[in-house]
Amino acid sequence: MSVRVIITEHARKRLRDYRQDKVTVNDIISAASSIPGKIPTATRFRGFFSKSGRVFDIVAKDLPTGRLVITVIGK
């Protein structure tokens, strides 16, 4: 089952910051899609790796229309 991933403008804007350097939209979609189950409230998920090797966290929540990625936090 594939989940629709919605990335907020805030999260897209943060990708341009230094701490999120080399984290791509595809990395975020892959990370959000890999989380099993339902996320009823905004929750931080830690320890994802981008293709470039950068470690990052995401804050996500499930909506009726898909999985909303609220922000990205680079390490």
Regions found by a protein language model. Name each.
Residues 1-75:
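Ribonuclease/tRNase effector modules and their secretory precursors
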